[in-house]
Amino acid sequence: MDINEIREYLPHRYPFLLVDRVTEITLGETIVAYKNVSINEPFFNGHFPHHPIMPGVLIIEAMAQACGILGFKTVNKLPADGYVYYLVGSDNVRFKRPVMPGDQLRLEANVIRGKRGIWKFACRATVDGELACEAEIICAERKVA
């Protein structure tokens, strides 16, 4: 999926769209997506000016956005139809290495279970094959419009 198709499945826009490309997707099972981390990201102005590191909460958000794409595509729904995926929880979050400008963040999510619009995913974010973050992410699909 290129950025144009991603924008059909995620309501997020600059500066909060954190998925640049999807390279693999198996509906109801797994997704592999990428975030290219650039020094031009607005959060690097304050986190930290002399040692820029991507905030951990934004790594979690990037993984959650990949989960949202997988969920939306699996159930064949779109934000344009009035649906949204909320990040409602995260468990067992661990950060293993910093993510810095120039890194390409690989986002992997696997469905643990999904029932009545509540989804749980096992997620990993890696840089050059090295684990940066892992978490279980819970999302809720809701009709908002």
Swiss-Prot record:
Active site: 47
Entry function: Involved in unsaturated fatty acids biosynthesis. Catalyzes the dehydration of short chain beta-hydroxyacyl-ACPs and long chain saturated and unsaturated beta-hydroxyacyl-ACPs.
GO cellular component terms given for this protein: cytoplasm; membrane
This protein's record includes keyword Cytoplasm: yes
EC number in record: 4.2.1.59
Subcellular localization(s) per the UniProt record: Cytoplasm
One BP annotation, GO: fatty acid biosynthetic process
Species in which this protein is naturally found: Chromohalobacter salexigens (strain ATCC BAA-138 / DSM 3043 / CIP 106854 / NCIMB 13768 / 1H11)
Record's catalysed reaction(s): a (3R)-hydroxyacyl-[ACP] = a (2E)-enoyl-[ACP] + H2O
Primary location recorded for the protein, binned into one broad class: cytoplasm
Domain of life: Bacteria
InterPro entries membership: FabA_FabZ, FabZ, HotDog_dom_sf
Keyword Cytoplasm: yes
Keyword annotations from UniProtKB, A to Z: Cytoplasm, Lipid A biosynthesis, Lipid biosynthesis, Lipid metabolism, Lyase
NCBIfam families xrefs: fabZ, PRK00006.1
Name of the protein described by the UniProt record: 3-hydroxyacyl-[acyl-carrier-protein] dehydratase FabZ
SS bonds (residue pairs): none
Family: Belongs to the thioester dehydratase family. FabZ subfamily.
